[in-house]
Amino acid sequence: MNNLNNLRRVSYKDFEQNAFNPTWSGWKTLIEIEKKLKPSKYYSDPISHMYLFLNNYWLEEAVRKALDLSYKSNDHMAIYDYSGLNMPDFVDDNGVTYELKQGKSLESLELIAEKDWHGCKVKLFYSRMDKCLYSNAGGAFNWHKLCSLDIKHINPDKGLKLKDIVL
């Protein structure tokens, strides 16, 4: 694994506090990091792309707290200058691994390749439509609702754009 201390990074807490501040000094680093990441399927604007990362952080934090899980790796508190690890997101006290995905609805599950679950024991899926977290510990479509979660969210279409940022 990469030594995270030697990488450029922006903490999610700093990003959260400055997400609508066009003069924030962290934008320069975020834009440099975004250039090294896999391009967004949804947004060509780098700032819109970065809002997706912040939204995902808020979801991961809510799930971690709701299910009393720990992060499997130490790369979940900041956006780093490298691609993520191919391992599950979470682990519980018994060593059971969990991977979290999200989509508009349960129908979105059809778009997630098995390899993207990273060999986890428990699959977690957050449906943005009904704001519910589901789990599947086996079986093709054996999903069970765990809980409702109202997650903070920035609509990237309504946030800042690169043209708004003062570098």
Please tell me what each predicted stretch does.
Residues M1-A66:
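Interdomain/boundary linker segments immediately adjacent to catalytic/signaling cores
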Residues D14-Q17, H49, G95, G119, ...:
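Intrinsic-disorder/low-complexity loop/linker signature
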Residues D45, S73-D93:
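Active-site metal-binding core of divalent-cation-utilizing nuclease and nuclease-like domains
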Residues Y57-Y82, K104-L106, K131-L133:
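Nucleic-acid endo/exonuclease domains
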Residues L67, F90-Q102:
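Conserved catalytic cores of phosphodiester-cleaving nucleases, focusing on short active-site segments
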Residues M87-P88, N94-G95, G119-L124:
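Short, surface-exposed beta-edge/turn micro-motifs
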Residues L100-L149, H153:
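Catalytic cores of nucleic-acid endonucleases
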Residues D150-L167:
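Charged phosphate-binding loop/patch that engages nucleotide di/tri-phosphates or the phosphate backbone
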